[in-house]
Each structure stands twice: as structure tokens, then as C-alpha cells.
Amino acid sequence: MGLGAPWNVVVLNDDHNTFQGVAFALSSTLPGVSYEQGMSLANRIHNTGRAIVWSGHKEAAELYWDQLRGHGLTMAPLERV
């Protein structure tokens, strides 16, 4: 792994967030993610228990992780790829 290795932002399934709430949080936080894409990710999170919702530089990953947690999403620790 190089120093610039990407970091994954992972959202976990839970029993308190709605599909719509997850889709809104993802689409309002992550660049380039539409509400429809957020709904698709929400389905993946629900069906598999987790989903990588963004991957990239550590500083941005930390920011998006904090913002998504602020929306009330259940977050896994950042994962270094």
C-alpha cells in the first residue's frame, strides 16, 4: 500500500434509518451522487448489511464520514484499500 492509497467510506445497515433518509444523506453529502443513486446504495446497504459509498483521499473520506454520521447514518470505521 502506498501512502496515497484510497480510503473507503462504508455505511452499515441499521434499524432506524429509512431508505429515503439514507438516500438524502448520501445525495446531499457525496459529490456526484443523485437521490436515485442514493436509493440504489440504500438498497445495497439493506440487502448486504453494508456498502462502500465513496473511495478516495483520506482527508475527504474523513470529511464525508463525519458528515454522513452527522446525518445519523451508522458508519463503519474508515477502511484503507
Spell out what each predicted region is:
Residues 1-81:
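Terminal domain-initiation and capping elements
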